[in-house]
Swiss-Prot record:
It catalyses: acetate + ATP = acetyl phosphate + ADP. Its EC number is 2.7.2.1. This is Acetate kinase. Keywords: ATP-binding, Cytoplasm, Kinase, Magnesium, Metal-binding, Nucleotide-binding, Transferase. HAMAP family: Acetate_kinase (MF_00020). ATP binds at residues 15, 206-210, 281-283, 328-332. Its main location: cytoplasm.
Length: 397
């Protein structure tokens, strides 16, 4: 048995779970918010007890010390020696990393080199790595990349129709994201179906405030909806998804906005927020959809884009064995799943409205005779991080 810390470090936040492996049992979990502020928030949950404090947390190193001290002071562990390894989420692995990797000084340097591909996320992820290495220098640490799962995509899926030197000199290509989630649910789907992953054609729909659809054939990602950045693909909470690129200079010309300002609109002021006119939260939009035409339109656009990707990816794989719904909306929105699945019967997808009336629970929602299965699988990226950390740290799980 091993105790693995799964870490997700943001620019001013630090999420953590202490997981007992191989049982995947969460012993403790918590969140540090507003790092660098005088009123930072530290919350931890262990043994059913929740503790929350507001205090000054100067930087990530202080946050890590608080995190570790809370684990010992609450008796979750007796000493830091009981932490066998630490797994870090890293958003972008570029073309360097097609798998998770044991962290060394050389690996840290490579992550730094590709940080320009994810300037908001990779530096924050690295800050978390440095903070833990400072306090737990002898403990093995593993980097788990959001992009790694998609490195199996063939060139025909990831290349853009742009001058070749843009790819060769600047790394411009499709990378895809949410890979850790797509990998986890695909492995879980194989278990539930009782079929080896190497014999399955799956479409994984990770639908939260950010959303992506991935075609998984024989256990490998062969295409995914997000692109060079997480802005591409389907309509999302505040992100536009795919648009005509000529709109960017057109909007600049009409509004006087800079390219960065237009990009900010596409990332933070578009998507469901723009379509509905009042919220990026699907729950709010669903609530008003019966009486608000724009809310109903937002739901139709959101579901319709995902619906199209399912048809496209089924064609790309020459068939389909199962559709997976995961993440906050995918797991909990009966309405969105219904809108996405309606009209796919011609593909052999027969879903049961009664079974679909479920939230946050692992469940098949197809009729027994349906050739294509439809499964809700709650994602667990932390468990996937822990599994990869155990595998690469050489721990006996």
């Amino acid at each position: 048995m091993s105790n693995v810390l799964a870490i997700n470090a943001g620019s001013s936040s630090l999420k953590f779970q202490l997981i007992k492996m191989p049982e995947e049992q969460v012993i403790a979990k918590g969140l540090v918010e507003r790092i660098g502020m005088p009123d930072a928030i530290f919350s931890v949950e262990a043994d059913g007890e929740k503790d929350k404090k507001v205090t000054e947390i100067a930087d990530h190193s202080v946050a890590v010390k608080m995190l570790l001290e809370s684990l010992t002071s609450t008796g979750v562990i007796q000493s830091f020696d009981e932490i066998d390894a630490v797994g870090h989420r890293v958003v972008h692995g570029g073309e360097y990393f097609s798998d998770s990797v044991l962290i060394t000084d050389e690996i840290i340097q490579q992550i730094e080199e590709i940080s320009e591909l994810a300037p908001l996320h990779n530096p924050a992820n690295l800050t978390g790595i440095h903070a833990f290495k400072e306090i737990l220098p002898e403990i093995p640490m593993v980097a788990v990349f959001d992009t790694a799962f998609h490195q199996s995509m063939p060139e025909a899926s990831y290349m853009y129709s742009l001058p070749r030197e843009y790819y060769e000199e600047y790394g411009i290509r499709k990378y895809g994201f949410h890979g850790t989630s797509h990998k986890y649910v695909s492995e879980r789907a194989a278990d539930l179906l009782g079929v080896p992953l190497s014999n399955l054609r799956l479409i994984s729909c990770h639908i939260g405030n950010g959303a992506s659809v991935t075609a998984i054939k024989d256990g490998e990602s062969i295409d995914t909806s997000m692109g060079f950045t997480p802005l591409a693909g389907v309509t999302m909470g505040t992100r536009s998804g795919n648009i005509d690129p000529a709109l960017i200079p057109y909007i600049m010309d009409k509004t006087g906005k800079t390219a960065d300002e237009v990009l900010n609109v596409l990332n933070k002021e578009s998507g469901m927020l723009a379509l509905s006119g009042f919220s990026s939260d699907l729950r709010d939009i669903e609530e008003k959809s019966e009486t608000d035409a724009r809310a109903e339109l937002a739901l139709d656009v959101f579901a319709g884009r995902i619906h199209k990707y399912i048809g496209s990816y089924a064609a790309k794989m020459n068939g389909l064995d199962a559709i997976i719904f995961t993440a906050g909306v995918g797991e909990n929105s009966v309405t969105i799943r219904e809108k996405i699945l309606t009209g796919l019967e011609f593909m052999g997808i027969y879903w049961d409205p009664k079974l679909n009336d479920v939230r946050g629970k692992e469940q098949f929602i197809n009729y027994p005779h349906s050739p294509v299965k439809v499964i809700i699988i709650p994602t667990n990226e932390e468990a996937m991080i822990a599994k990869d950390t155990v595998r690469l740290s050489g721990l006996n799980s």
